[in-house]
Regions:
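Membrane-proximal helix-turn-helix segments that form the acceptor-binding/catalytic region
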Residues: 74-81, 97, 101-105, 118-119, ...
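A charged, aromatic-enriched C-terminal amphipathic alpha-helix characteristic of glycosyltransferases
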Residues: 336-340, 349-375
Length: 375
């Protein structure tokens, strides 16, 4: 398996590695530790994680990131050539060039797992930038060409039965690429605690990658519409390219508006469990300008929160909102509507939800797709 993050952790990568290991296969995850923060070698969930340290290459720097990924790809390719695997599993589009090259030279089959529309990420810092728009189109074209060479394609979302909103499966279909949907549903479920309707102390959280400032600006706008004595505490946890800006935004809100907030960085799976148990509502509303939200992105935090009984506020007018309301695990509201977000938070504050569709369904689809390529 190849992934361009440090896999410390990456739940989808580790879940797929665990399923293959459980099925009797040896799995090595080749991960790019850009900030060189984690052990170079680690065993986790039955898989070996090899982390490549290639100098400090921070997230967000476009040219540095491109050069770093090219260097990482070259190193991984050399490692795999030294001891060729039976199968290469590509997590996201920025790892495809490795598998395409080795399939051409050594006939090694590969799976493309499209977590997200990777070409939309480059537009995140400046959605109106013409240069970033052109680069995004080039990345998309390359991804489609490489994906066509895959022996199987797996993705994270698809239109639900009787639904109206498309997912990534439909995006791939529009490019004449067939795929299997394996959603990011957690393996472990917690027994949810019933909320106390008389309890005035409550907490709203955001746990995950901190990629966009606008999500947190909207969160604060919604919270400020709640009377001061009834406002929730905020818990923000996660790392990403906007981490420092979000921290500063929250510190200003604490000082100027009396908002109560805890802000922290990256967390482990165990720490996530401790954090999510403190929440009453998960905030998972994203700016739709970059494209992947309206095309079917499903926030992992929505499923992880529901597995712990916590409802989420998510975007309306897209697949995530449709699933949240169909499965009764959250409330969908329009982007940039602070009043609607405020109303949804208040509506959900004492609600306990249950995630009835778990990863078992996803595991069966995953194994039926991947195992025929190696067994």
């Amino acid at each position: 398996m190849v992934v361009t993050n440090s896999c410390a952790p990456d739940p989808r990568v580790l879940r797929s590695a665990f399923w293959l290991s459980e099925a009797g296969h040896q799995v090595t995850v080749h991960a790019f530790d850009r900030l060189q923060l984690h052990a170079k070698s680690e065993s986790l969930h039955g898989a070996r994680i090899m982390r490549y340290h290639l100098g400090d290459i921070p997230y967000g720097g476009m040219l540095k990131s491109i050069r770093g990924i090219m260097q990482f790809s070259k190193r991984v390719k050399a490692t795999l050539l030294h001891s060729p695997p039976e199968l290469i599993y590509c997590h996201d589009a920025d790892t495809l060039s490795i598998a395409v090259s080795l399939k051409k030279s050594h006939g090694i089959p590969f799976v493309f797992d499209m977590h997200d529309l990777h070409h939309t990420w480059i537009r995140m810092p400046a959605p109106k930038s013409i240069l970033r728009k052109l680069l995004s189109r080039k990345m998309e074209s390359t991804m489609i060409r490489h994906a066509g060479k895959a022996d199987a394609i797996i993705t994270t979302s698809g239109k639900i039965e009787g639904g109206i909103h498309d997912g990534f499966e439909q995006y791939l279909q529009s490019k004449n690429l067939a795929s299997i949907v394996v959603e990011n549903r957690p393996i472990e479920m917690s027994i949810p605690q019933q909320r106390n309707p008389e309890n005035k102390d409550w907490t709203v959280g955001y746990l995950g990658r901190v990629r966009e400032l606008k999500t947190f600006t909207l969160m604060l706008e919604a919270i400020k519409l709640i009377p001061t004595t009834e406002r929730p505490k905020l818990i923000i946890a996660g790392d990403g390219i906007r981490e420092n800006e979000v921290r500063e935004l929250m510190l200003n809100a604490i000082e100027s508006d009396g908002i109560e907030a805890d802000v922290s960085g990256a967390f482990t799976p165990d720490q996530f469990q401790e954090l999510v148990k403190q929440l009453d509502v998960m905030f998972a509303i994203y700016p739709p300008e970059r494209g992947n939200i309206l095309q079917g992105a499903l926030p992992v935090k929505m499923f992880d929160a529901a597995a712990n009984g916590v409802p989420s506020v998510v975007n309306s007018g897209c697949l995530m909102g449709e699933i949240a309301e169909a499965e009764e695990i959250g409330k969908a509201v329009a982007w940039n509507d602070a009043q609607a977000a405020c109303d949804a938070l208040l509506e959900l504050r004492n609600k306990t939800v249950e995630l009835t569709i778990t990863s078992q369904r996803e595991k069966e689809k995953f194994l039926s797709t991947v195992l025929p390529l190696i067994d």
